[in-house]
Amino acid sequence: MSPAMLQASSLCVSAALSGAASRPGRLASQGHQGKRAVAQPLAASAVTEAAPPAPVVAPPARPVDAPRRRGGRGGGGGGGELVAWKSVRQERWEGALEVDGELPLWLDGTYLRNGPGLWNLGDYGFRHLFDGYATLVRVSFRGGRAVGAHRQIESEAYKAARAHGKVCYREFSEVPKPDNFLSYVGQLATLFSGSSLTDNSNTGVVMLGDGRVLCLTETIKGSIQVDPDTLDTVGKFQYTDKLGGLIHSAHPIVTDTEFWTLIPDLIRPGYVVARMDAGSNERQFVGRVDCRGGPAPGWVHSFPVTEHYVVVPEMPLRYCAKNLLRAEPTPLYKFEWHLESGSYMHVMCKASGKIVASVEVPPFVTFHFINAYEETDEEGRVTAIIADCCEHNANTAILDKLRLHNLRSSSGQDVLPDARVGRFRIPLDGSQFGELETALDPEEHGRGMDMCSINPAHVGREYRYAYACGARRPCNFPNTLTKVDLVERTAKNWHEEGSVPSEPFFVPRPGATEEDDGVAISMVSAKDGSGYALVLDGKTFEEVARAKFPYGLPYGLHCCWVPRKRNSK
């Protein structure tokens, strides 16, 4: 393809990926010249006080070693690999779980965890953690007992791959292999329309205010509704508005009454802020933030909100339309690093859609924001926004460290890039610059910090505790669970040699008045090839119980909790 054709193709991709580009909105200030800142299942209702039912199918065999990529690309599978990085062997399973310890009797509901679980098709192995087809895991708790399940999410991408034995949609680093030049041209046409983008919803899982459960990824078409009781794929979640766009934040902010999301616009670089009422499929336009730097919007995997404001981050890791056209990925995949473009934090009023602050901040890289809240003066006036995130010291290396051959490496070297709790202070007094500091000594959590949760009652409000994955070094991936105390600036850590825990999801005890009164639940892939749901006391961060699967499960990403009142029949 000629450079001219490539440039034209990139423009077409940008047009396809823009969201609500023609919608009117309020723009962030373009000025501020000056010095740069530095710095899943058996129906849950069937679980009774009686002994749990026996498995309805035999447990799967041990997960299969992933094959080496044809042609020698990528890392292969060996017998010494951890089960966390091996493909799940069976499409679905359900049955009773053996419990060690005592589960709290108040723990009554369903824990769901989503994430990639299938990284190979026949003898073809995928490159990257984020390429895997979605595997939904469920653990239902009741009366001190647990029933577990897993199932593949029936996305169009997964069904097509299963039917044809090859990648048929564009995943994070994988693209369909064209048979000839005409086939390649046809693929470009489908990319421009968005039809070749994946709907593989392997990232998040959320419960909407009306009880519907969605699995999500960064493509809007990858919003898929599932049944939390059966793990059946109900179907695509169809947005009924005309906001458009093909990509959005993988992590919306969801409460009992509303749903907030960001839609990047690659034509006029910026972000559309939208909200949706519980029970509705219609997103409503709230406002627009124009980017202050760079050729494209910064990546927005997640974002925080406060009671009255939406915080829109703009980091130098920016979307790159031309990288979408590549058959082979760059080390930054769909992104480019534009340090010269600056880093910014924008604050929008929820009620009016107006930009109330747009400040330059030191460079940063984050996948996940933890929380945000409003700082007030003695008279109760909001003077600043505090926003915390899992920050990777402005180092983009973490993206390539998540290649599967890196994760499967058993070299024993300390190759996990450092991370910290980064705390932004965004003044609302018209200042040009904001601050970014380290909220606590990173050695408290082994200089690893990601995959976080908090007490849901404190979303958008002042808080003290966060639960996340940390590190015990040397390691190549977060291998501990961490409770962070942001007041005392300390951390408590749980670690089991050779295990790979996933996001610790905090479930508050009903009626609790203290922020850390509850449990943190994490799915753990153990060194011996087994898997279990670990339940830690929210206060002491000591093990309460573990519900053991009869087989090992691959690593997963994000979780949600469905209380019994929501999923009972």
Curated annotation (Swiss-Prot):
Positions that bind Fe cation: 251, 301, 368, 558
UniProt record, GO biological process: carotene catabolic process; secondary shoot formation; strigolactone biosynthetic process
Record keywords, A-Z: Chloroplast, Dioxygenase, Iron, Metal-binding, Oxidoreductase, Plastid, Transit peptide
Keyword match Hydrolase: no
Transit peptide: 1-43
Subcellular location: Plastid, Chloroplast
A Pfam short name: RPE65
Enzyme Commission number(s) from the entry: 1.13.11.69, 1.13.11.70
InterPro entries, per the entry: Carotenoid_Oase
Disulfide bonds: none
UniProt note: phenotype after gene disruption: Dwarf phenotype with increased branching and tiller number, and strong reduction of the root levels of strigolactones.
Domain of life: Eukaryota
Disordered: annotated segments: 23-81
Keyword Metal-binding: yes
GO CC, alphabetical: chloroplast
The protein, known as: Carotenoid cleavage dioxygenase 8 homolog B, chloroplastic
Annotated organism of origin: Oryza sativa subsp. japonica (Rice)
Organism phylogeny: Eukaryota, Viridiplantae, Streptophyta, Embryophyta, Tracheophyta
Gene: CCD8B
